[in-house]
């Protein structure tokens, strides 16, 4: 059921960080309520990219995406960027009204840049505001005790979102008395 209080969490895995030359290879989404309880999860979608695109990845991406199995999933996938965008958009629309939720995640501006370029319908559907968990991590480093949330960093889109939600819960309890 749709609610303007629900939050849209998205994570992307890309072939690199340069929005002009790199591509999205995986997208996942989770919807939570405002108290960060998970309402629904969209299965992660591996997005097909050509061997030319995959071969242009830097060493870090090659290593990590190979270890997680994502590179092979991308090669095997028949799903285009446009089809993945449509699937995720349909998922989001079930739970969140148009432009009512900020885009939520860790270092979410980087994902937002890729969404704006390659999945503009999702970008437009989300409110222009963003809820970036990284901000609280940095505030804890600067003004808190510096003891942060321990992350596994699996670099799998759905796992990364779950971890971001858990991290926000951690910092909400630790830093915010609201």
From Swiss-Prot:
Active site (catalytic residues): 128
Enzyme Commission number(s) of this protein: 3.1.15.-
One of the GO biological process terms: DNA metabolic process
Class of this enzyme: hydrolase
CDD domains: Orn
Function: 3'-to-5' exoribonuclease specific for small oligoribonucleotides.
Family according to the record: Belongs to the oligoribonuclease family.
Name of the featured protein: Oligoribonuclease
């Amino acid at each position: 059921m749709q609610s303007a209080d629900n939050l849209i969490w998205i994570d992307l895995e890309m072939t690199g960080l340069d929005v002009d030359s790199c591509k999205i290879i995986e997208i996942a989404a989770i919807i939570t309520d405002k108290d960060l309880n998970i309402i629904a999860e969209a299965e992660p979608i591996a997005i097909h990219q050509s061997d030319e695109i995959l071969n242009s990845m830097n060493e870090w991406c090659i290593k990590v995406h190979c270890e997680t199995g994502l590179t092979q999933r991308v090669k095997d996938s028949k799903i285009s960027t446009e089809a993945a965008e449509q699937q995720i958009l349909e998922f989001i629309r079930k739970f969140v009204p148009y432009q009512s939720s900020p885009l939520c995640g860790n270092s979410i501006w980087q994902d937002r840049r890729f969404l704006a370029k390659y999945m503009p319908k999702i970008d437009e559907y989300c409110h222009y505001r963003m809820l970036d968990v990284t901000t609280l991590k940095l505030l804890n480093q600067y003004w808190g005790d510096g003891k942060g949330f321990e992350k596994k960093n699996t670099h799998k889109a759905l796992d990364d979102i779950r971890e971001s939600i858990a991290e926000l819960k951690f910092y909400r309890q630790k830093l915010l008395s609201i």
